[in-house]
Amino acid sequence: MSDSISVIREKLNQVTSEHDPFFQKCMQDERKGVEKLLQTTRRKWEKEAQLRNKLEEMKQYETDLFQQGYKYIAGVDEVGRGPLAGPVVAAAVILPDDFSVVGINDSKQLSEAKRDALYETIQTEAIAVGVGIIEHNVIDQVNIYEATKLAMRAALDQLQPEPDFVLIDAMPLKYTEAELSLIKGDTKSISIAAASIIAKVTRDRLMQMYDEKYPGYDFANNMGYGTKKHLHGLDTIGICPIHRISFAPVKEAKLHFDSLK
């Protein structure tokens, strides 16, 4: 074969099977560079196949429900139960039955760049998206568990059309009789995973904004979780207006600074 390595690389990017005549021709090329390109191409195909298989696995709950006659299946998830500061955010997403975007998974397993890209895709292709945000002061009043349910209900209330079935990550919500709670649902249901991405990106952007408003806690990086830098900020600056007073480290910091007044 007279093609250069760079030309072969470009051509292999268009090939989708080992049975392709060009791939077969490359297999006869004894150059080490071509051999490496073939190995890279095979690995790419394997990864793409894994992603397609994962997509089909994660659509199984939705597929079964569509076959039962349900039309608007909402997935619900939340982010922000554990942080010491900021709101808890929930999202609800209704996807069309032909949604086939690979790579959607539990938002915590995705890079920030991948989450941001999928966020835009979901917002564009979803039938409906709802977001519920429950602030720190309500969390302190009702506790984080109840606040999470409030956020989920608020997200579901925004959906138009209304869902006729609800898939929820982990916690029973009793929003409707037609609902199912799935442990680790964001790794099992495409709708819940999509909701986890919407919730995560929404909350992360809020915390990045709060980092500019309340510097000294590293909110842009820790998203309000109790990291070393965040705890150092509590020890040296005290609390800020978005801290959750009912959470132990925040309560202790408040008591300490109140005692100095």
Swiss-Prot record:
GO terms for biological process: DNA replication, removal of RNA primer; mismatch repair. A divalent metal cation binds at residues 77-78, 169. One of its GO terms (molecular function) is manganese ion binding. Pfam families: RNase_HII (PF01351). Manganese or magnesium. Binds 1 divalent metal ion per monomer in the absence of substrate. May bind a second metal ion after substrate binding. It is found in: Cytoplasm. Its EC number is 3.1.26.4. It comes from the Bacteria. It is an enzyme of class 3 (hydrolase). It catalyses: Endonucleolytic cleavage to 5'-phosphomonoester. Endonuclease that specifically degrades the RNA of RNA-DNA hybrids. This is Ribonuclease HII. It comes from Listeria monocytogenes serotype 4a (strain HCC23). The lineage of its organism: Bacteria, Bacillati, Bacillota, Bacilli, Bacillales. The gene is rnhB.
